[in-house]
A protein has these predicted regions:
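Histidine-acidic metal/acid-base catalytic patches
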Residues: 1-9, 13-31, 61-64, 96, ...
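Active-site-proximal loop/turn and secondary-structure-junction residues that shape catalytic pockets
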Residues: 11-13, 36-38, 73-76, 104-108, ...
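A short beta-strand-loop structural module common to alpha/beta enzyme folds
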Residues: 30-41
């Protein structure tokens, strides 16, 4: 089996899951990362009715898209949010996903709790039986205060389970972590199980994440590092535009198509 290449439905923030499914399929992709991020993009969510969730499942099948992962960000430092994350695990299982993505802290809400890496590892370790029960792998995203692969690898190593790895978000590692990309990839490569391919435009600290190939992030370096390490982790494309967002649906659809063309030009098969 070749590398899975998907698109994160969060690219369609502010638009419906149906619009996301249609645009991603039209660009030639066969896989999707569903977004269930509280307070931000709730394309699917545990409190939606069974009928509504089934409609989404049928639309995916109709368009030939496999929901192989789900973005279910919760603050894993906060005991009060662990139950919410377990609900997200079960929702991911409902869609037949193999991966669930979360940052350590909240992705788009204020953190109500902070904790040491050891405490976070304990919280995650307690989730492993749920992950095993549903056949899921939890991938921790480079985000916020945990913006480097190096930091996340320390937590993953403390957890010590094959069910837990890193989701290396390429642009986040620069935007949040201010890393030397090559060195950080080297330091965390053996724990990277998943990758958000996200480009970076503008100044490093500016919210600017365009279509792949439209920014300045060194993707050939990333691809070379992965190839040399024999790491064929799934790719999930994420495009978040600028703080103002995409101007319309057509701009998102074009950015998704541009990203597909960028990857195929680099020898990848969608």
């Amino acid at each position: 089996m070749g590398r899975i290449i998907a698109v994160n439905s969060n690219c369609y923030h502010g638009y419906s899951i149906e619009q996301a499914i249609d645009g991603i399929a039209a660009a030639g992709f066969r896989y999707i990362e569903l977004t269930a991020t509280k307070g931000w993009t709730e394309h699917v969510f545990p409190d939606q009715s069974f009928e509504r969730l089934w409609q989404v499942k049928e639309r995916l099948a109709e368009k030939g898209l496999t929901p192989f992962s789900m973005s279910g960000h919760c603050n894993l430092m906060d005991p009060a949010r662990i139950h919410d994350f377990i609900s997200n695990i079960r929702l991911a299982a409902f869609f037949g996903c193999g991966y669930i993505v979360s940052s350590i802290g909240e992705a788009h809400l204020s953190d109500q709790a902070v904790a040491s890496n050891e405490v976070v590892a304990e919280h995650i370790r307690a989730l492993v039986p749920e992950l095993e029960k549903y056949g899921l792998t939890l991938v921790l995203e480079t985000h916020g205060d945990h913006g480097s692969g190096r930091i996340l690898k320390e937590i993953v190593d403390r957890v010590g389970s094959p069910r837990v790895g890193i989701n290396y978000d390429t642009a986040n590692a620069l935007f949040y972590g201010n890393v030397d990309l090559g060195a950080d990839l080297d330091a965390s490569m053996d724990a990277i199980r998943y990758m958000h391919l996200k480009d970076k435009g503008g100044e490093r600290t500016v919210w600017d994440f365009p279509a792949l190939g439209k920014g300045w992030l060194d993707f050939p370096l990333v691809f070379d590092k992965l190839a040399k390490a024999g790491n064929d982790c799934p790719f999930s494309i994420e495009i978040e535009f600028t703080q103002a967002g995409a101007k319309d649906l057509a701009e998102i659809n074009q950015a998704v198509k541009d990203s597909a063309e960028y990857l195929t030009a680099h020898g990848f098969v969608l």
